From Swiss-Prot:
Catalytic function, reaction form: 3'-dephospho-CoA + ATP = 2'-(5''-triphospho-alpha-D-ribosyl)-3'-dephospho-CoA + adenine
Keyword vocabulary terms for this entry: ATP-binding, Nucleotide-binding, Transferase
Pfam family for this entry, one: CitG
GO MF annotations, alphabetized: ATP binding; triphosphoribosyl-dephospho-CoA synthase activity
Superkingdom assignment: Bacteria
GO biological process, one term: prosthetic group biosynthetic process
InterPro entries listed in its UniProt record: CitG (IPR002736), TriPribosyl-deP-CoA_syn_CitG (IPR017551)
Gene source species: Streptococcus pyogenes serotype M6 (strain ATCC BAA-946 / MGAS10394)
Transcription found in the keyword field: no
Protein name: Probable 2-(5''-triphosphoribosyl)-3'-dephosphocoenzyme-A synthase
HAMAP family assigned to the protein according to its UniProt record, in alphabetical order: CitG
Enzyme Commission number, as recorded: 2.4.2.52
Similarity comment: Belongs to the CitG/MdcB family.
Enzyme class: transferase
Amino acid sequence: MTKAVLTSISQLALKALLYEVSLSPKPGLVDRFDNGAHDDMSFMTFIDSMIALSPFFQAYIETGFAYAKEEPLLLFNRLRQLGQKAEEIMFCATQGINTHKGLNFSMALLLGATGAYLARTPHLMTDLGCFSKEDTLAICRLVKPMTAHLIQADLGHLNTKKEFTYGEQLFVTYGIKGPRGEASEGFTTLTDHALPYFRQMISQNDPETSQLRLLVYLMSIVEDGNLIHRGGIEAWKGVKADMRLLLQQDLSTTDLRLALSSYNQCLINQHLSPGGAADLLALTFYFAFLEKLL
């Protein structure tokens, strides 16, 4: 019974990634219609990546459940080791293309935290599907003590390095903390912004319209390292401003799709991709499935 429940939840994580890549149109991002601002990946590349990562989603939640009483840092280390192996398998599947590196990191922590939370709340194991927004908040809060050390440990000594990863370079140049920052703060962008917004949207609109509006909302608020990496601070600020204006127009679903299609070409021309917003979109979907919003 326990394994079946954990398996079903890990499949919701995979489903969240599938929903994210399938949502269309998404400006600058890979979707069903085109490859956005990416010339090295496609919809099929994302499918290959997800299939490679899927077994690890199961491992993340099972690890959290099995080691729920362990010190948070020790649980983090277990999850990170699994996540690094998953990353290797992902890169093999995509021939070296980074489709889900940051999202895999975040999902490892959130699935691990979900497993740990389930071990402490056995009623959810027998009454699966009754996750509340309070449960979501509690799961995200479990990540905070696991990652309290992370910024200092990973980014505090970069002055001794000569070569930086993409994430390290963003921190050195702009102070952008990326997925590490989200995790160390307990995913407050999710709990305080994305999920409240989506709960409101889904109560008023059909699922696809709600998802598209959520994407626009995230693009208007997220500190998006992908955009900043590709275009700098001003390009990122420009995208945020454009998305705020789009939200204010309160367009019909048909007009919203047309506007997003047009903006997609704009971002393609500038080689801009809001990958940070896309990752948070997928994470929001994961909790939306747990809460039965979708």
